A protein has these predicted regions:
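Charge-rich, well-structured scaffold segments of protease-associated domains
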Residues: 26, 84-225
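Boundary at the C-terminal end of the N-terminal hydrophobic targeting segment
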Residues: 17-21
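M16/MPP (pitrilysin/insulinase) zinc-metallopeptidase core fold and M16-derived inactive scaffolds
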Residues: 40, 45-109, 175-177
Length: 225
């Protein structure tokens, strides 16, 4: 599903570039915004890409980008754990995220009438994650289970072995999901250090595709971030 949505968004942007109907703007905070209005259906996708992934990790914190991605959905100072999920689900939203070697991205697809609410929650999640220790330990178990599952998947093992042969010294050698040894022991402070280093608006690209007014969408992003 994550791969399908990523391809879908990129196809939309490619189509926008071809048609010349998209708008790209750099905000005063350094954030890049891309807006492509499509009025065919009353729906909109907000997708923020952070220019960081496992390539920006070290051998000591490998897997932190993916682990942090899981933790962004665990509440903020304004919205306790579960509150955002409740609000967005009540409005028919689809929310997800993905981490790769080069980037991490988070998206919301929602009826366009709730665009302002979605953008406010989206920015709050990306800028003010709370990462409660209790939730961190829950997600630690989830990620460790994912690592164990990957270790028992033949196709994944083939990919990892090929990756090891191709990248012996390059940062691409690191697995996006990390290792059980590191994920099992990494501290909350280390995760927050990574967040503080890379999750600034100047390191983000926010795409808005769907039933929106370009100027209003850009103004809302600037207000929210």
């Amino acid at each position: 599903m994550k791969k399908i949505l990523t391809i879908f968004i990129m196809l939309l942007i490619t189509a926008a570039v071809w048609a010349g109907e998209y708008t790209v703007q750099k905000l005063p905070n350094g954030q890049t915004v891309v807006v492509y209005p499509i009025k065919d259906n009353p729906i909109v996708t907000i997708d923020t890409w952070i220019k960081t992934g496992s390539i920006n990790e070290t051998d000591e914190n490998n897997g932190v980008a993916h682990f942090l991605e899981h933790l962004f959905f665990k509440g903020t100072k304004s919205h306790p754990t579960g509150d955002m999920d409740r609000i967005l689900e009540s409005k028919g939203a689809v929310v997800n995220a993905a981490t790769s070697k080069d980037f991490t991205h988070y998206y919301i697809t929602i009826p366009s009438e709730y665009f302002d609410t979605a953008m406010e929650l989206h920015s709050d999640m990306l800028l003010h994650p709370q990462i409660p220790r209790k939730e961190l330990e829950k997600e630690r178990k989830v990620v460790l289970e994912e690592i164990a599952k990957d270790g028992n998947t033949p196709s994944k093992k083939v990919y990892d072995n090929l990756n090891d042969m191709l990248y012996t010294k390059h940062p691409y050698k690191r697995k996006v999901i990390g290792s059980a040894d590191i994920i099992g022991t990494i501290r909350r402070e280390e995760i927050l250090d990574y967040f503080n280093n890379y999750y600034a608006p100047s390191n983000m690209i926010t795409l808005v595709v769907g039933d929106v007014d370009t100027e209003k969408a850009i103004a809302k992003i600037q207000q929210s971030f």
